[in-house]
Amino acid sequence: MTKTKIMGILNVTPDSFSDGGKFNNVESAINRVKAMIDEGADIIDVGGVSTRPGHEMVSLEEEMNRVLPVVEAIVGFDVKISVDTFRSEVAEACLKLGVDMINDQWAGLYDHRMFQIVAKYDAEIILMHNGNGNRDEPVVEEMLTSLLAQAHQAKIAGIPSNKIWLDPGIGFAKTRNEEAEVMARLDELVATEYPVLLATSRKRFTKEMMGYDTTPVERDEVTAATTAYGIMKGVRAVRVHNVELNAKLAKGIDFLKENENARHNLS
């Protein structure tokens, strides 16, 4: 049975929109990682720069100081480690420590050395769709063009196709209607040769789904609904805060999909 990968979010920042300040010391980060592994995480995604609206850019030195001690403490755990960074210097420092994956929210567009660094260490990379919100074509067409172009550049740099993931970038450089369009047409991204990761957890899109004001934590059940929808559309991984809820849901949806496929094959 094909298992949907669960990526647990570990923000080692003081100002992330959902859990800023909770895990920005090594001891609390270690405890959170152990808990997420017990809850069913396949991948831990460590981030040292907040992406919340209005966040301040931190220096390279500050990002290194936030991320490296935590990565060093958890890299030996029995779980795949990803680092959420768009800086090749941070990526290389973490890859030297033994991380498996780089999650680049700018898909190599911010730092053109990113692909060669990831290729050098034979690691995986996630390419997330981003931008300034201005586009000359419909959002899904622009997303596909941009991501496939960057994936091609990653392959030229030496990263094999099976180590390149695509993320549609829900919550980044898109209007509410554009996010809804991307979600409705996820299968078009899934139809490419690359595995897709969906990252909606506790974001504005899930707040809009609720139809009334909520705190980030109150959006977990609706996040799980997007997990179920994404799996049915064919995504291969989800990036979430609430690992336990989404891992259980994904296991159930995976079973039902496998059951349906098996019965179709018998008919």
Swiss-Prot record:
<keyword id="KW-0808">Transferase</keyword>
<comment type="function">
    <text>Catalyzes the condensation of para-aminobenzoate (pABA) with 6-hydroxymethyl-7,8-dihydropterin diphosphate (DHPt-PP) to form 7,8-dihydropteroate (H2Pte), the immediate precursor of folate derivatives.</text>
</comment>
<feature type="binding site">
    <location>
        <position position="11"/>
    </location>
    <ligand>
        <name>Mg(2+)</name>
    </ligand>
</feature>
<dbReference type="InterPro" id="IPR045031">
    <property type="entry name" value="DHP_synth-like"/>
</dbReference>
<feature type="domain" description="Pterin-binding">
    <location>
        <begin position="1"/>
        <end position="251"/>
    </location>
</feature>
<dbReference type="GO" id="GO:0046872">
    <property type="term" value="F:metal ion binding"/>
</dbReference>
<dbReference type="GO" id="GO:0004156">
    <property type="term" value="F:dihydropteroate synthase activity"/>
</dbReference>
<feature type="binding site">
    <location>
        <begin position="239"/>
        <end position="241"/>
    </location>
    <ligand>
        <name>(7,8-dihydropterin-6-yl)methyl diphosphate</name>
    </ligand>
</feature>
<dbReference type="InterPro" id="IPR011005">
    <property type="entry name" value="Dihydropteroate_synth-like_sf"/>
</dbReference>
<keyword id="KW-0289">Folate biosynthesis</keyword>
<dbReference type="InterPro" id="IPR006390">
    <property type="entry name" value="DHP_synth_dom"/>
</dbReference>
<keyword id="KW-0460">Magnesium</keyword>
<feature type="binding site">
    <location>
        <position position="51"/>
    </location>
    <ligand>
        <name>(7,8-dihydropterin-6-yl)methyl diphosphate</name>
    </ligand>
</feature>
<feature type="binding site">
    <location>
        <position position="84"/>
    </location>
    <ligand>
        <name>(7,8-dihydropterin-6-yl)methyl diphosphate</name>
    </ligand>
</feature>
<comment type="pathway">
    <text>Cofactor biosynthesis; tetrahydrofolate biosynthesis; 7,8-dihydrofolate from 2-amino-4-hydroxy-6-hydroxymethyl-7,8-dihydropteridine diphosphate and 4-aminobenzoate: step 1/2.</text>
</comment>
<keyword id="KW-0479">Metal-binding</keyword>
<feature type="binding site">
    <location>
        <position position="167"/>
    </location>
    <ligand>
        <name>(7,8-dihydropterin-6-yl)methyl diphosphate</name>
    </ligand>
</feature>
<dbReference type="GO" id="GO:0046654">
    <property type="term" value="P:tetrahydrofolate biosynthetic process"/>
</dbReference>
<dbReference type="Pfam" id="PF00809">
    <property type="entry name" value="Pterin_bind"/>
</dbReference>
<protein>
    <recommendedName>
        <fullName>Dihydropteroate synthase</fullName>
        <ecNumber>2.5.1.15</ecNumber>
    </recommendedName>
</protein>
<comment type="similarity">
    <text>Belongs to the DHPS family.</text>
</comment>
<dbReference type="InterPro" id="IPR000489">
    <property type="entry name" value="Pterin-binding_dom"/>
</dbReference>
<feature type="binding site">
    <location>
        <position position="203"/>
    </location>
    <ligand>
        <name>(7,8-dihydropterin-6-yl)methyl diphosphate</name>
    </ligand>
</feature>
<comment type="subunit">
    <text>Homodimer.</text>
</comment>
<feature type="binding site">
    <location>
        <position position="103"/>
    </location>
    <ligand>
        <name>(7,8-dihydropterin-6-yl)methyl diphosphate</name>
    </ligand>
</feature>
<dbReference type="GO" id="GO:0046656">
    <property type="term" value="P:folic acid biosynthetic process"/>
</dbReference>
<dbReference type="GO" id="GO:0005829">
    <property type="term" value="C:cytosol"/>
</dbReference>
